[in-house]
């Protein structure tokens, strides 16, 4: 699991085109968020059968990070471009859904962009010492 986290004052995306592994329906087709921790998340082959432990560690890190930066808004953004060893799309979709539920159970407001769609996106990264983080699980 590879994750690029950016603390953004503004983040937006809009679905443009589906890929062969696109989830249907693409919902929501677009989103705009303020003061959000945007998590570009890549599910890899090595993550298979480790989902529960990854979710536990991911949730703990996000709770810590959002507390440190004063943000409770999280955007999960599926992002295959962080790895050449992708896990199956079916498992990745399920993982992201489970992760969203686990984060919401901790009281965070969580949004997830559609899996398997090309998206245009724009962001303004806050630029403080914790605004950009990379994690591997």
Q: At which residue positions do the language-model features occur?
A:
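Short glycine/threonine-rich loop-to-helix capping motif typified by GTGT followed
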Residues: 84-93, 124-128
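Domain-level signal for soluble alpha/beta catalytic cores
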Residues: 3-6, 39-49, 110, 127-129
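Conserved mixed alpha/beta catalytic, RNA-binding, or beta-rich assembly cores of soluble enzyme
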Residues: 9-68
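Alpha-helical scaffolding segments of alpha/beta enzyme cores, especially the outer helices
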Residues: 60, 64, 91-101
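Short glycine-rich, basic-tinged beta-strand/loop micro-motifs
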Residues: 70-86
């Amino acid at each position: 699991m590879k994750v690029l986290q950016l603390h953004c004052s503004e983040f937006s995306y809009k679905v443009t085109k589906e890929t062969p592994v696109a989830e249907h329906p693409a919902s929501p087709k677009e989103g705009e968020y303020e003061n959000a921790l945007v998590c570009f998340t890549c599910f890899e082959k090595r993550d298979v059968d480790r989902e529960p432990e990854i979710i536990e560690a991911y949730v703990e890190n996000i709770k810590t990070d959002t507390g440190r930066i004063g943000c409770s808004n999280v955007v999960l953004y599926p992002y295959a471009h962080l790895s050449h060893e992708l896990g199956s799309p079916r498992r990745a979709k399920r993982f992201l859904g489970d992760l969203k539920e686990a984060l919401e159970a901790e009281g965070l407001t969580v949004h997830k962009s559609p899996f398997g769609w090309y998206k245009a996106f724009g962001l303004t990264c806050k630029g403080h010492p914790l605004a950009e983080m990379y994690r591997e699980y």
